[in-house]
């Protein structure tokens, strides 16, 4: 059996895997255990009561967290004319059409989010094999193919997170940094839960939000007591 590191032993001793923690208690514990030499992200895993094998039960979308994610986001936009100017004014780092596509084909991808106006998809469509595997392909379901590219840029900059369940029906995303105060992390989590509830498939049966766990980049998962989240109980 692999030998436990000192850090892993501390986590094992501090975290009760059988317990559901109040959100404030959970955040305090995560902060205590976040000893990496960088500011760790706070990640969430939400187990949904869906059958991920059925296409009509898959959950996908995006929402802007009230306090952002703490990340600096670089945005690339495929647009032309007035839309291109609007994207630049909104803060997009890269704006173009064929010229931007050529950069990407050369492997120049210094961006985190790609947004496209509908008329630009004829250009973006050529990049599916490059952007798709990296989770960067624009998609109308998450608001990254839109006639209002300026709003999409502002949302990306403001802390929008995209979510999509995996094959086990679990949503994985980030809700902030470990140096956020507890109330901001709680409000970000509640905002995500509200978005997930709104996205509930009509065919999903039984308990929808089955389990919520928080963890830091280098830490263990802590299960959350959902009764302490107003978004869940109201």
UniProtKB/Swiss-Prot annotation:
**Name this protein carries in UniProt:** Large ribosomal subunit protein uL1
Database matches in SUPFAM superfamilies: Ribosomal protein L1
The superkingdom of the source organism is Bacteria
The UniProt function text for this chain reads:
Binds directly to 23S rRNA. The L1 stalk is quite mobile in the ribosome, and is involved in E site tRNA release. Protein L1 is also a translational repressor protein, it controls the translation of the L11 operon by binding to its mRNA.
In terms of Pfam families, this protein maps to: Ribosomal_L1
Q: Which GO terms describe its molecular function?
A: rRNA binding; structural constituent of ribosome; tRNA binding
Q: How does it assemble?
A: Part of the 50S ribosomal subunit.
Give the InterPro entries listed for this entry: Ribosom_uL1_bac-type (IPR005878), Ribosomal_uL1 (IPR002143), Ribosomal_uL1-like (IPR023674), Ribosomal_uL1/biogenesis (IPR028364), Ribosomal_uL1_3-a/b-sand (IPR016095), Ribosomal_uL1_CS (IPR023673)
Q: Which gene encodes it?
A: rplA
Q: Which organism is it from?
A: Yersinia enterocolitica serotype O:8 / biotype 1B (strain NCTC 13174 / 8081)
Keywords associated with the record = Repressor, Ribonucleoprotein, Ribosomal protein, RNA-binding, rRNA-binding, Translation regulation, tRNA-binding
Q: Which GO terms describe its cellular component?
A: cytosolic large ribosomal subunit
Q: Which GO terms describe its biological process?
A: regulation of translation; translation
Q: In the record, what lineage is assigned to the organism producing the protein?
A: Bacteria, Pseudomonadati, Pseudomonadota, Gammaproteobacteria, Enterobacterales
Return the similarity comment. Belongs to the universal ribosomal protein uL1 family.
Which PROSITE patterns does its entry note?
Answer: RIBOSOMAL_L1 (PS01199)
